[in-house]
Amino acid sequence: EKLNLLNLPFRLQKISSGIINDSKSTNSASLLYAINKLNFKGDLIICGNPNKENYSELHIKGPRRVFIYGKHRNELLNILKHENISTFVNLDEIFNILKNDKNKDILFSPGNPSGNDYSNFIERGQHFNNLKEKYFD
């Protein structure tokens, strides 16, 4: 029986106009799938521990900007290839920048296990939703 991935919590979940929470994205395949499926051209937010997949580099094509945050940000910065990457200590710092953008086109697709940032993808997804409400609503 075919499982419909779109019905899982935090799997490409549109939480408001232009904002998608894909916190369930715990590997590079799901991250790249999300970018391609949405033909995504906006701001991508990535976090988590990349050690599980052990890849040397990952090319991100499509998004306008890539924001990396969390305890694993330096490891991710060494691996991810994109012309416009910036790193932050926490997600609040990213929302602080994005709140000033008129057009909100945001994909939260971490592409890695939570590592030392969160206990699991559910906590991570709820944190994103809470900050979205705090900064945008």
Language model features with spans:
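Nucleotide phosphate-binding/pyrophosphate-handling subdomain across enzymes
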Residues: 1-64
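Short glycine-rich anion-binding loops that position phosphate/pyrophosphate groups of nucleotides
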Residues: 26, 49-51, 72, 107-116
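Short, well-ordered alpha-helices that flank and scaffold nucleotide-derived cofactor binding pockets
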Residues: 33-37, 78, 130-134
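Short, glycine/charged-enriched secondary-structure capping and boundary segments
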Residues: 34-35, 58-60, 80-82, 120-124
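Structural beta-sheet core signal
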Residues: 44-46, 68, 108
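C-terminal helical cap/extension that packs against the catalytic core
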Residues: 51-106
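Glycine/aspartate-rich loop-and-adjacent alpha/beta segment that forms the canonical ThDP
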Residues: 110-137
